[in-house]
């Protein structure tokens, strides 16, 4: 029954339309610094209909149709400095987004009377936006090889988690467990990356074949 229940609730209708435009600008400073900048605009329009399920009555009903729309401007900048033929430095800044899953957005209600639990969707979810900074330095060996070091930092806004509340009242009824996806807040990630590549064919030429 639980499998059938999940299939009924997850059976929804959704339509997403994304209209986008992009502009790009390239410029070379002197002979060793290159700039590439861009701006992407995305307009997202959503329309969806979910289902409500109550295991006490074993009935499923359609919810009303919900609509939502939003606009995002996503800039990107990349700078490359050719210090010399063997040494390169790169820096970049980008904004990216991740849209909520349809199953989290649809206004569905799933009531489990046996365990006194309720799960509902959240049509007010916002997309997750990531602000990304990257800096790297690459050194190329003349004898075919590369050593690279990099630093990255990401600031993430409105990431999505399942909010779980206990003994929560919803529409006049108290439930032991209430679950709903929500935009939780912000997160910060950073890290270092190192890599080393080298052609070791000079040790054992037979390894090339």
Q: Where do the model's predicted regions map?
A:
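Outer membrane beta-barrel strand-and-loop segments of large Gram-negative receptors
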Residues: 9, 122, 126, 146-208
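Transmembrane beta-barrel outer-membrane domains
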Residues: 12-18, 66-72, 116-118, 126-130, ...
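Outer-membrane beta-barrel channels and translocator barrels
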Residues: 30-32, 82-86, 130, 142-144, ...
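Signature of Gram-negative outer-membrane beta-barrel scaffolds
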Residues: 1-84, 110
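Gram-negative outer-membrane beta-barrel proteins
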Residues: 11, 31, 43-51, 67, ...
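Hydrophobic, lipid-facing positions within transmembrane beta-strands of outer-membrane proteins
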Residues: 17-23, 73-79, 121, 131-135, ...
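Surface-exposed extracellular loop regions of Gram-negative outer-membrane beta-barrel proteins
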Residues: 85-132, 153-178
